[in-house]
Amino acid sequence: MPLPDFRLIRLLPLAALVLTACSVTTPKGPGKSPDSPQWRQHQQDVRNLNQYQTRGAFAYISDQQKVYARFFWQQTGQDRYRLLLTNPLGSTELELNAQPGNVQLVDNKGQRYTADDAEEMIGKLTGMPIPLNSLRQWILGLPGDATDYKLDDQYRLSEITYSQNGKNWKVVYCGYDTKTQPAMPANMELTDGGQRIKLKMDNWIVK
């Protein structure tokens, strides 16, 4: 059952900055090695973060629908996180709270849904097949289960290619926020066939 009036998030025009395709300067030469100590150190620094939060703009584009929203993502512990989507007027459209074995989602009518898999729930209720389980790692600049990826000249992720459950995701990182330590993604794009997901992070708070 789709979320009641969820697609009110479609209020357009979509932010041009969010929808602009990623442009990445490809490093000359073979690129940085995934076996480099700098990359291993960066991954370790990110994994050492206990809590973090970010907010920004979200867009989902496919042949069936075009959705724009503001988002707030907060991780409070291992496998405990909160995702909030609001429409351009600032009203909450979706709030998701996840912890091991339990996921709760509240829609814009106050209807509460529960499940044990956040990714499956989001897909069924919104019609957007967001790879949430992998995105939890990708949004941090970590490859997760992906083994096919490239690094930029600063030993950070620049591209990921990942296939699972019939989906072939390509993730491109358009930039990083170097005001935080370690540097965190500032702009990224996920594509799978005719669907595209854009995330632009305004800022990060890490602990």
From Swiss-Prot:
Functional note: Plays a critical role in the incorporation of lipoproteins in the outer membrane after they are released by the LolA protein.
Keyword terms of this UniProt record: Cell outer membrane, Chaperone, Lipoprotein, Membrane, Palmitate, Protein transport, Signal, Transport
Protein name: Outer-membrane lipoprotein LolB
One of the Pfam families matching this protein, by short name: LolB
Membrane topology annotation: Lipid-anchor
Domain of life, source organism: Bacteria
Coarse class of the protein's main subcellular location: membrane
Organism: Shigella dysenteriae serotype 1 (strain Sd197)
Taxon lineage: Bacteria, Pseudomonadati, Pseudomonadota, Gammaproteobacteria, Enterobacterales
Gene from which the chain derives: lolB
